[in-house]
């Protein structure tokens, strides 16, 4: 009995499908549109029951929604100012105004955005304490356990100015006693006689001048150093004078006629002005006969 029931249910299903979608048997022209309209109406009612239909004029991409942009210019300027301030601060700003063609109220003007911290007005209204940089911003970023003196680094010490590097005299230094003219003359005469004194001579000489042995000893040491400096300066002068000097003709100086410089200049001029395959221009020679006074040698010398 079970196979018979299955066989009878199959033709019934096919019949229903054919009756719903296939053409009628009569094939009349006036009958097909009515059936199609009935089918479309039935499907539309099912979709409307499942999803509410939105008017075409309220869609975001409709012509009415695109042409219904009635926002005030003040709202645009506030949004632009806020976006520019946010871009300068490195943050992202989302527009709070109503988008054109939104489902809310397309014709309602968008309310101006309140001034934030990143807008120009917000920056101008901030107190001066907020605009001034904190003295130590690292303290704000630290956790409580880092702010404890045990874990926090010691405060930076201010560097004191460097101490004076000049040599300081001893506190117990004796004041300098100036020598009299008679003592200086006697010391100078004794130094010319003998630069080094023995202990006995120094004791006798210091007692005759009413000076201590230390004062006489130090004066002789300073006088020997001065004599050494003077001697080195004299030797340097002698070395400078002994070095050969440059010929005066090299500096273009003129001498009287018949002098050695005139002969050397004439020989050089004849040498360079001689005719040959590679002829050179004659060197300029100072007029010899214009100056009759003898010019001294220069102080320049060859090293």
Curated annotation (Swiss-Prot):
- A GO-annotated cellular component: transcription regulator complex
**The protein's assembly and partners:** Interacts with CREBBP/CBP, TBP and SP1; interaction with these transcription activators may inhibit autoinactivation. Interacts (via C-terminus) with PIAS1 (via N-terminus); the interaction is required for the localization of both proteins to the nuclear periphery and specific binding of MSX1 to the core enhancer region in target gene promoters. Interacts with H1-5.
Compartments where found: Nucleus
Q: Which GO terms describe its molecular function?
A: cis-regulatory region sequence-specific DNA binding; DNA-binding transcription activator activity, RNA polymerase II-specific; DNA-binding transcription factor activity, RNA polymerase II-specific; DNA-binding transcription repressor activity, RNA polymerase II-specific; p53 binding; RNA polymerase II transcription regulatory region sequence-specific DNA binding; sequence-specific DNA binding; transcription cis-regulatory region binding
Query: One matching Pfam family, short form?
Result: Homeodomain
Record keywords = Developmental protein, DNA-binding, Homeobox, Isopeptide bond, Nucleus, Repressor, Transcription, Transcription regulation, Ubl conjugation
Cited SUPFAM superfamilies:
Homeodomain-like
Q: How is it modified after translation?
A: Sumoylated by PIAS1, desumoylated by SENP1. Sumoylation of Lys-15 and Lys-133 not required for interaction with H1-5, transcriptional repression, inhibition of myoblast differentiation, or binding to gene promoters.
Reported consequences of knocking out the gene: Knockout mice die shortly after birth. Development of mesenchymal molar tooth buds is arrested at the bud stage, as a result of reduced expression of Bmp4 and Lef1 in the dental mesenchyme at 13.5 and 14.5 dpc, there is no change in expression in the dental epithelium. Decrease in the expression of the Wnt signaling gene Tcf7, and an increase in Dkk2, Sfrp1 and Sfrp2 in the mandibular molar tooth mesenchyme at 13.5 dpc. Expression of Dkk2 and Sfrp2 expands into the distal tooth mesenchyme in mandibular molar tooth buds at 13.5 dpc.
Covalent link (Glycyl lysine isopeptide (Lys-Gly) (interchain with G-Cter in SUMO)) residue numbers: 15, 133
Q: Which domain of life is it from?
A: Eukaryota
Annotated region of DNA binding: 172-231
Task: Kindly report the protein's main subcellular placement as a broad class.
Answer: nucleus
Q: Where is the composition biased (Low complexity)?
A: 32-44
Functional description taken from the UniProt entry: Acts as a transcriptional repressor. Capable of transcription autoinactivation. Binds to the consensus sequence 5'-C/GTAAT-3' in downstream activin regulatory elements (DARE) in the gene promoter, thereby repressing the transcription of CGA/alpha-GSU and GNRHR. Represses transcription of myoblast differentiation factors. Binds to core enhancer regions in target gene promoters of myoblast differentiation factors with binding specificity facilitated by interaction with PIAS1.
Q: Name one GO biological process term.
A: negative regulation of striated muscle cell differentiation
Originating organism: Mus musculus (Mouse)
Output this protein's name.
Answer: Homeobox protein MSX-1
């Amino acid at each position: 009995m079970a196979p018979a029931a299955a066989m009878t249910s199959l033709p019934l299903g096919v019949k229903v499908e054919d009756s719903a979608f296939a053409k009628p048997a009569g094939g009349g022209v006036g009958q097909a549109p009515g059936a199609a309209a009935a089918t479309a109406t039935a499907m539309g009612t099912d979709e409307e029951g499942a999803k509410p239909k939105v008017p075409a004029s309220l869609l975001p991409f409709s012509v009415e929604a695109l042409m219904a942009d009635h926002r005030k210019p003040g709202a645009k300027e506030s949004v632009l100012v806020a976006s520019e301030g946010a871009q300068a601060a490195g943050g992202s700003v989302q527009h709070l105004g109503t988008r054109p063609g939104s489902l809310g109220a397309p014709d309602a003007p968008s309310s101006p955005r309140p001034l934030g911290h990143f807008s120009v007005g917000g920056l101008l209204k901030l107190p001066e304490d907020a605009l001034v940089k904190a003295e130590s911003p690292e303290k704000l970023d630290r956790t409580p356990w880092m702010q404890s003196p045990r874990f926090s680094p010691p405060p930076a010490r201010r560097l004191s100015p460097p101490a004076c590097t000049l040599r300081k005299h001893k506190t117990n230094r004796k004041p300098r006693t100036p020598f009299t003219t008679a003592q200086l003359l006697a010391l100078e005469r004794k130094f010319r006689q003998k630069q080094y004194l023995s202990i006995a001579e120094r004791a006798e000489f210091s007692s005759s001048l009413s000076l201590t042995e230390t004062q006489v000893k130090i004066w002789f040491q300073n006088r020997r150093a001065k004599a050494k400096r003077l001697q080195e300066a004299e030797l340097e002068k002698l070395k400078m004078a002994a070095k050969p000097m440059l010929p005066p003709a090299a500096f273009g100086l003129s001498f009287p006629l018949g002098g050695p410089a005139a002969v050397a200049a004439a020989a050089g001029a004849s040498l360079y002005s001689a005719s040959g395959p590679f002829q050179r221009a004659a060197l300029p020679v100072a007029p010899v006969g214009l100056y009759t006074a003898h010019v001294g040698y220069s102080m320049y010398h060859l090293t």
